């Protein structure tokens, strides 16, 4: 979530999809993440967070991920149930969204009114590029210095606004499998 822009993306992966979670974290490079105790069993994910991500990681109580509390908070914030937001049949995504909203209400003084909708990101709609492929292709940062200059994004980005820049980066980070 980005409370400054109002963007909130939600996704759900299979329980054994540690590699996909790591790739998603690497794609977004969040400055802060929240998680529950269940993630501590996911050694690949925790190792990536500790060694590569360099962000604030906040361990939250499992109570914050309670399904009913999540549903109530989602309904209160968006004025509609999670099913109306496209989260029917996605219980893990609903619980994560509820925990995120609870965390944002607790820590953010303002800006939450900008979050008026969510976008469910279906992992099957975009090409799966792991961290190694993304690094070797130099999509958004060079292998040697980690700079933007010299990357595909640097070559293509002729956008005029910050929102356009974010959209261009999103297109490169998650190319569609079927653009039609």
Describe the function of each predicted region.
Residues 1-180:
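Charged catalytic and DNA/RNA-contacting regions of genome-maintenance
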